[in-house]
Design a protein with these regions (language model features):
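Single-pass alpha-helical membrane anchors
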Residues: 2-32
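Surface-exposed, glycine-biased beta-strand/turn segments
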Residues: 29-102, 132, 162
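Residue-level recognition of beta-strand microenvironments
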Residues: 54, 88, 94-95, 122, ...
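Short, basic/aromatic beta-hairpin or loop at an interaction surface
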Residues: 63, 68, 106-115
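Short hydrophobic beta/alpha edge segments that flank linear recognition/processing sites
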Residues: 75, 103-106, 131-143, 152
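Short polar/acidic secondary-structure junctions
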Residues: 80-81, 96-97, 141-144, 155
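Short histidine-centered loop motifs in beta-beta connectors
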Residues: 84, 94, 109-133, 157, ...
Length: 170
């Protein structure tokens, strides 16, 4: 082996080891973020839970009507599970009595809005300032619901509903 080939081999080995270390640490960081409920985009998850109904077209579980649009994701949690604000913001809406039962909408500092429905207890009022991680409510089974869960929505600054799974639960 020539000196040039030896240096090339050593350099390539060093690059491969460095790349392996970076990949290993990225996986560890992603695992820790997932365990803590955090995401790489700066959001935290309002609750760590299994997604039981995805964003998009589906069969309505209450009516059986096909091709209805589900504007958020459903997260399976027992009634009384603490719900946290995923990012700082201002409580824009607190309401009850509709299909979502007890609901909250928060406008966040990045222009996005998050919505929370079927809550058993709301701990904030309209105009409240919330910090990331603040306890805002407890999950429940109010409104048009088939069982205890959190219906979680994400609205872009343009006003269009987007899939929370892609941005916060990925």
């Amino acid at each position: 082996m020539t000196r040039k080939q030896l240096y090339w081999s050593i350099g390539l080995t060093a690059v491969m080891i460095t790349a392996g270390i970076i990949i290993y640490h990225r996986k560890r960081i992603k695992k820790k973020l997932t365990e803590a409920g955090d995401t790489a985009e700066g959001w935290i998850r309002p609750v760590v839970a299994k997604i039981t109904s995805k964003f998009g077209h589906r069969t309505d579980p209450k009516t059986g009507k096909t091709n209805t649009f589900h504007n958020g994701i459903d997260l399976a949690v027992p009634s009384g599970t603490p719900i946290k604000s995923p990012m700082p913001g201002i409580v824009e809406t607190v309401q009850s009595g509709g299909a979502g039962g007890n609901e909250i909408i928060i406008k966040h500092i990045n222009g996005y809005k998050t919505g929370y429905a079927h809550l058993s207890k709301v701990l904030v009022t309209k105009g409240d300032e919330v910090k990331q991680g603040d306890l805002i409510a407890y999950s429940g089974n109010t409104g048009k619901s088939t069982g205890p869960h959190l219906h979680f929505t994400l609205t872009a600054p343009t006003g269009v509903k987007v899939d929370p799974q892609k941005m916060i639960y990925s």
